[in-house]
Amino acid sequence: MANAWRTARVFISSTFRDMHSERDYLVKVVFPALRERLEPHRVHLVDIDLRWGITEQQSENDEVLALCLDQIDECRPFFVGLLGERYGWVPKKLPDAGSKYGWTQHQTGKSVTELEIRWGVLLGDVMRDHAFFYFRDPAFLNDVPPAKRTEMTSESDEAARKLAALKEVIRSAGLPNPVVEN
């Protein structure tokens, strides 16, 4: 079975509202090019972009975080993190303490994006070698039309502080792949 096809799943983590263009570029340009390069090696690449994969019912039933973390588990060891100036949505309800994701009970006030990054990369070694982080340069906002800029700026001063702290944790985590900032 040396010639059997293998599947590589890549989880894309970011806030949704401000990273549409970056996610679109990955999905429409980068991943198709990677698929082409991997096909001769019998590797099927699947990108997991949950922008369109979360239903209204899942949102209403507080299932979003568990769904995201489940998908990260399915994608191990591949993780791509995109961070701009938004911290992201903070869930009001976290998974039950007795569940697989009970560790989140001590993470009150953290965004889904931060919890994805912690679960996927920072809390274990499985994804460290295959995690890639890209931080968008805040100066980028200078070129964004004012009407769109509000969707790409921090939700609040507190959110900006949390995001800055998260970025620093990622930078200082000793990951083998350097954080790309531009």
Where are these regions (language model features)?
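Conserved catalytic or regulatory cores that recognize and/or transform ribose-phosphate-containing ligands
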Residues: M1-N182
